[in-house]
Amino acid sequence: MDGNTLFLVTAAAAGLAGLLDRLILRRGQVSDVTVEPAGSEGGYRCYVLHYHASSDPDWSEVTYSFRDRKRPTTVITGRTRSLAGCAIGSNDEYLLIRENLLTPGPWELTVRITTTCRRNPFYSLFPLKASKTIQVQIQ
């Protein structure tokens, strides 16, 4: 085998391994996402985010936003953060929204968890996504 053929075979094997990792193993996938209200505390509305991590979600990020249903251009976005510290299996996290930003009426809370990977470019091209939206009535 000459050098060019060896390079092409190695590159094809690495690409195939990356594709199989993304399509079959789905490392860091987060599923079973649910969101529930948990009351108010210290000027914040609390919501509990439940999810299941199939493996270490080192490159997963959670984002959440609150949208006013009466005025859809009014959106309150929470801070994007990593799920790097969570355990394999079922996990819970609190999402906090400042109450003084909310007006009475119907609101929509949307939570998105996106998993990418810096080692495998197929996760960047086709990230794993999970989301949940709930309707909330603010008094």
Predicted regions and their residues:
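N-terminal signal-anchor transmembrane alpha helix of single-pass membrane proteins
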Residues: 1-31
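Solvent-exposed serine/threonine-rich low-complexity stretches and specific carbohydrate-binding patches
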Residues: 73-88, 132
